[in-house]
């Protein structure tokens, strides 16, 4: 192993590597979400015919995983480094292994395994062929080829690579607790995040107002529907994300029964599907601007026929 990179050096290294592969370096999307996949930079851009290559860090909130800052590996909020490439390069796995080498991890010196783990997100109507990537026995990455997003079949296929930054940093820095990770020289992860972890856990499990959350879910759902009636995809999707996070808070609080849980997930999924269809329709009206001229002309001609 080379010099132990800090957390922010890991991010900078990955950004530089994927920038070299032609990815847009996006910024984290400013609405709560449970995974980088739910960012519009992945969810929306994975559907339709236009090419899209992007990489970004996404803070991901999972209220039920909060442990008051007492568990060394389970967190209310963790960070993912998300890469999406569409169409998927034929050498995407080789590129991924090369990215690990940039981080000082030589694939020839470590046990790196791709373990089949097909992916599904019921609340957004999304699924794909997938693998977990295990490094010396620890999962550090999820690899997915999207087959369906928002209930729509994908084409061309999008490849998604999701690095778990805390796990990766724990491995590189050889620490047992995420709170001991060096975020930057002289500053530990715990000095930044242990207090928010405690407070968000306490809020999620003990303090949140269930009646308010239930009311908000319905309001967010109706507002998403209103936005969709006006063809406003991005505001509508923001409210879908708010529905999802509100549901996760309700779930963490134990305010949703098993039967109700399925109903809430179905309501979010129905909205996500309409968002996906509307997004593709709106991009088509614009003439799919990210396509090259020849492909665009051919595609629009086929649709006209």
Swiss-Prot record:
Quaternary assembly: Tetramer of two alpha and two beta subunits.
Keywords: Aminoacyl-tRNA synthetase, ATP-binding, Cytoplasm, Ligase, Nucleotide-binding, Protein biosynthesis
GO molecular function term, any single one: ATP binding
Family, as annotated: Belongs to the class-II aminoacyl-tRNA synthetase family.
Gene3D superfamilies, alphabetized: Bira Bifunctional Protein, Domain 2, Class II aaRS and biotin synthetases, domain 2
Organism of origin: Streptococcus suis (strain 98HAH33)
HAMAP family attached to this UniProt entry: Gly_tRNA_synth_alpha (MF_00254)
Matches recorded under InterPro entries: aa-tRNA-synth_II/BPL/LPL (IPR045864), Gly-tRNA-synth_heterodimer (IPR006194), Gly-tRNA_ligase_asu (IPR002310)
Protein name: Glycine--tRNA ligase alpha subunit
GO biological-process terms attached to the record: glycyl-tRNA aminoacylation
Subcellular location: Cytoplasm
EC main group: ligase
Reaction catalyzed: tRNA(Gly) + glycine + ATP = glycyl-tRNA(Gly) + AMP + diphosphate
The enzyme's E.C. designation: 6.1.1.14
Pfam families: tRNA-synt_2e
TM region positions: none
GO (cellular component) term, any one: cytosol
Cleaved signal peptide residues: none
